[in-house]
Amino acid sequence: VGTALGSLAEELNGYNRKKGGFSFRF
């Protein structure tokens, strides 16, 4: 589960960077 969560967080970070909008903080 921890690995999946990390992967999701990384994907979200990349998506936000692409959009250049807001940043996610966990």
From Swiss-Prot:
Swiss-Prot/TrEMBL GO biological process terms: neuropeptide signaling pathway
One GO CC term, this protein: extracellular region
Organism domain of life: Eukaryota
Coiled-coil stretches: none
Residues with the Phenylalanine amide modification: F26
Keywords: Amidation, Neuropeptide, Secreted
Main localisation: secreted
UniProt subcellular location: Secreted
GO terms assigned for molecular function: neuropeptide hormone activity; orexigenic neuropeptide QRFP receptor binding
Presence of keyword Secreted: yes
Tissue specificity remark: Brain.
Pfam name, any one: RFamide_26RFa
Annotated function: May have orexigenic activity. May promote aldosterone secretion by the adrenal gland.
Family per record: Belongs to the RFamide neuropeptide family.
Protein name: Orexigenic neuropeptide 26RFa
Species whose genome carries this gene: Pelophylax lessonae (Pool frog)
